Design a protein with these regions (language model features):
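N-terminal pre-domains immediately preceding structured catalytic cores
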Residues: 2-214
């Protein structure tokens, strides 16, 4: 029980304080029998660790489902790339397929902290009133989950590598665009939601499957 306490506290904090209202009512497919099982097998048929988190991002639905303990815990609205899906460098497209979270960045940052090249910019913090558009600029805010592709030739390796393309899940100052494509390749979440996802996944094996639709 003691080992589970940090996870229970993180889940409680993430769902009750940070996270936006669960959006699964708008995506009933995620609550249907078989949804979790359909996203349980990693590339090569490998099964995820028992304490793993599975994140499924649907491009068509512009939504992210977080799976833990064999159930969907929460569905969040996202923005993927306005240019569509793809894996080529400089395409500004969101890559499909399986990834893992390679690095969690910004766990101690205050909400609205601006990051450049994954480093917090001292003194540059956007207030919550600036999270719904700030002069048209696209900021990386609050938290970063840096993705690493797991499928060689699709999102891993020369010419398609998600990690070297700096594909992140991150907070944004364009929260008003969530629910529709708007990014330059990354997966945007609201700043409260990215804090929730960070809290629920940090230190645990976390796999991200980016799909055309749920």
């Amino acid at each position: 029980m003691r080992a589970l306490f940090p996870l229970i506290m993180a889940a409680s904090l993430a769902t009750s304080v940070f996270a936006s209202p669960d959006a699964s009512a708008d995506f009933p497919v995620v609550r249907r029998p078989g949804f979790v099982a359909a996203h349980a097998a990693l590339p090569g048929g490998r099964r995820a660790e028992t304490n793993a988190v599975i994140i499924v991002v649907s491009v068509a639905d512009q939504a992210l489902a977080l799976i833990s303990g064999g159930e969907v815990l929460h569905v969040y609205r996202v923005s993927t790339a306005v240019a569509g899906v793809g894996s080529k460098p400089n395409s500004e497209k969101t890559p499909l397929g399986w990834h893992r979270v390679a690095e969690w960045i910004g766990g101690d940052a205050v909400p609205g902290q601006v990051f450049v090249s994954r480093k917090p910019v001292p003194g540059e913090i956007l207030r919550h009133t600036q999270w719904r558009g700030d002069g048209g600029r696209d900021y990386v805010l609050t938290r970063i989950l840096w993705l690493d592709g797991l499928e060689y030739g699709r999102n891993r390796g020369p010419g398609v590598d998600s990690h070297s393309r700096f594909i992140y899940i991150h907070g944004t100052n364009q929260e008003h665009l969530l629910g529709r494509p708007a990014s330059h390749g990354c997966i945007r979440l609201s700043n409260h939601d990215v804090m929730a996802v960070y809290a629920l996944t940090e230190g645990r094996p976390t796999y991200v499957e980016i799909v055309d639709r749920f």
